[in-house]
């Protein structure tokens, strides 16, 4: 923690005279990687000591996380990384809250599956079927995370090699889930 604080005071003391117009601060060190909790206090410290916009980053996975980061750090903007994996609507949900004060509901099962299928289709158009189907396996796993019986479906999709088979598996999974509701 001391290294972080020393680094922040160095940044703050220079007041970024080198022409930087904004700075993004992640509340976690490289050594921490994804472990532990992001230290939003460091973002707040930088914000309090510089005159340029500060972009906060780290541990924003839900609308509530974004609200808490803004309130705790007073940062000017938020950058989202892993929180958008399998969750691209997080940006719309945060923007909606910022404009209305209302938190939109989580996307439905159908929205998640249809978004995964659209993402897969775009990936195939961009990279070709062979590469896209393989690269999309991890993305589809993120879309399905937390859904009923998703571990089985993820395992099955990880063995599929064609676009059409992945789409069929996603559609049959969605129908199975809707039948159980």
Named regions from a protein language model:
Residues 25-35:
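Glycine-rich, proline-tolerant flexible connector loops at the mouths of alpha/beta enzymes
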Residues 1-11:
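Single conserved hydrophobic/aromatic residue that forms the stacking wall/gate
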Residues 9-22, 34, 41, 45-56, ...:
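Alpha/beta catalytic cores of nucleotide-metabolism and tRNA/nucleoside-modifying enzymes
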């Amino acid at each position: 923690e001391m290294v972080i604080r020393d680094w922040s005071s160095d940044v703050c003391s220079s007041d970024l005279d080198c022409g930087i117009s904004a700075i993004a601060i992640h509340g976690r060190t490289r050594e921490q990687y994804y472990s532990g909790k992001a230290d939003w206090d460091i973002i707040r410290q930088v914000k309090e000591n510089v005159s340029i916009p500060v972009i906060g980053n780290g541990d924003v996975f839900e609308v509530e996380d974004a609200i808490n980061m803004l309130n705790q750090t007073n940062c000017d903007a938020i950058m989202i990384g892993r929180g958008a994996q399998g969750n691209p609507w997080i940006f719309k949900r945060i923007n909606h809250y910022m404009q209305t004060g209302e938190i939109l509901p989580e996307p439905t099962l159908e929205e998640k599956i249809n978004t995964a299928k659209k993402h897969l289709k775009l990936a195939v158009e961009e990279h070709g079927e062979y590469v896209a189907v393989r690269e999309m396996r991890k993305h589809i796993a993120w879309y399905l995370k937390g859904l009923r019986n998703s571990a089985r479906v993820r395992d099955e999709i990880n063995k599929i090699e064609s676009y059409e088979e992945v789409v069929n598996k996603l559609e049959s999974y969605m129908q199975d889930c809707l039948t159980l509701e």
